[in-house]
Amino acid sequence: MASEAMELNGGVNRRDDPGARPQQGRMSRNTPLNMNHYANKKSAAESMLDIALLMANASQLKTVLELGPSFSFYIPLITLISISLTLQIIVGILLIFIVKWNLNDSSKHYILNLLENIVTALVFIVVVVNVFITAFGVQRPDDKTS
């Protein structure tokens, strides 16, 4: 098992001194990947994308509300945008929990895996809902005065 861990971390069959420690550096191939750091960066990137989509949906909601009930797809768009915003807030909260828990604690692996799967499913639903929002269209009619 120890040799397997050494092999995974790049310490087996090295040409230099067998007792030498792996180089410590940001881009070194010999340093093991810090999974907690990687997961935190991944979750932060997902959160930034979630914030961008949240802002886009808020803008779409504002436009639909300005168009008023006379707009042909008023109720469906209000419903879809509200669903999308709610799901995005839930995803954001779940991502905060995922980032806060220590990935190296094996007792938390099951719950972290479950949360990751839930977040993935919710993000898929958000994407599908936003496809329908785009299909219905949220553009203001052109004000042509002639």
UniProtKB/Swiss-Prot annotation:
Q: Which residues lie on this side of the membrane: Extracellular?
A: 1-75, 136-146
Q: Where is this region: Helix alpha1?
A: 41-52
For this record, the Gene Ontology CC terms, alphabetical, are: plasma membrane; synaptic membrane
Residues carrying a glycan: N57
Spell out where the chain crosses the membrane: 76-100, 111-135
Where do the segments described as Helix alpha2 lie? Answer: 55-71
Q: Which UniProt keywords apply?
A: Angiogenesis, Cell adhesion, Cell membrane, Cytolysis, Glycoprotein, Inflammatory response, Membrane, Synapse, Transmembrane, Transmembrane helix
* Activity control note: In normal conditions, NINJ1 is inactivated. In response to death stimuli, homooligomerizes and disrupts membrane integrity by introducing the hydrophilic faces of alpha1 and alpha2 helices into the hydrophobic membrane. Homooligomerization and ability to mediate plasma membrane rupture is inhibited by glycine; it is unclear whether glycine directly or indirectly inhibits homooligomerization.
Q: Where is this region: Disordered?
A: 1-33
Q: Which GO terms describe its biological process?
A: angiogenesis; cell adhesion; cellular hyperosmotic response; cytolysis; ferroptosis; heart development; heterotypic cell-cell adhesion; killing of cells of another organism
Q: Which superkingdom does the taxonomy of this entry point to?
A: Eukaryota
Q: Which residues lie on this side of the membrane: Cytoplasmic?
A: 101-110
What family is this protein classified in? Belongs to the ninjurin family.
What function does the entry list?
Answer: Effector of various programmed cell death, such as pyroptosis and necroptosis, which mediates plasma membrane rupture (cytolysis). Oligomerizes in response to death stimuli and forms ring-like structures on the plasma membrane: acts by cutting and shedding membrane disks, like a cookie cutter, leading to membrane damage and loss that cannot be repaired by the cell. Plasma membrane rupture leads to release intracellular molecules named damage-associated molecular patterns (DAMPs) that propagate the inflammatory response.
User: What protein is this chain from?
Assistant: Ninjurin-1
Q: Which gene encodes it?
A: ninj1
